[in-house]
Structure formats: structure tokens, C-alpha cells
């Protein structure tokens, strides 16, 4: 858990996929505590821990999560251009935000309907 002023305001979850492949599996900071450098501090601490035994540290972010991507870029992370592909079993629960062309295929960028 991430504590700020003695209060739990978020969490960090690190994971390892073997072979020195280490990931920030999850980072969450309560909305009312965002913008205070808490996430940046948490990532810095995670990097310090992981750098003691690994050569690199990976973070995944949804393409639509611009705020997170800007933070990770500011902290020195580069895009690997990986693609996560999903099959929706309940298409009616999603709405299409945009379409992206990858190679010669069109993919819909979706989110859960509110």
C-alpha cells in the first residue's frame, strides 16, 4: 500500500515473469491524491528495488490512458510498441472510441460502456 500522511492512498504491485523480466503490474493512487508526486515517488521506489537485481523494468499502459503514458515518458520510459489483443464475449458492454491500423488490419479501441 502507498501511505501519505499515515493514510492509505494507493497501491503498488510489482511482478516478475522470470528471466529478469520485472513489471509494474499495478499502480493506483486515489484521485484526490493524484498530482502530488505520489505515483512518481512510488515508481522511483519500485525502480530502486528492481534495479538491485534486474536490467530493466517494464510498465504496460492502455493507449487511452494518456495521463499515465505522459508520466511514464517523463520518467524515462520508452514505448516498445507491443500490442495487446482482446476478444470481447459481450460486445454490447463496450463502446468503440477509435480505430487503429496495425500492419494491414484495423483494430477497434474500446472501453466499457458507462
Outline where the language-model segments fall.
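Acidic-residue sensor for enzyme active/binding pockets
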Residues: 25-26, 47, 60
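Alpha-helix C-cap/termination motif
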Residues: 17, 49-53, 78
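Conserved beta-strand-loop-alpha-helix junction that forms the acyl-donor binding cleft
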Residues: 59-69, 85-92
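Conserved acetyl-CoA-binding loop-helix of GNAT-fold acetyltransferases
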Residues: 29, 35-48, 66, 70-74
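Short loop/turn motifs at secondary-structure junctions
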Residues: 23, 53-55, 76
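Conserved GNAT acetyl-CoA-binding A-motif
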Residues: 50-62
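Acetyl-CoA-dependent GNAT
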Residues: 1-25, 30-31, 43, 79-84, ...
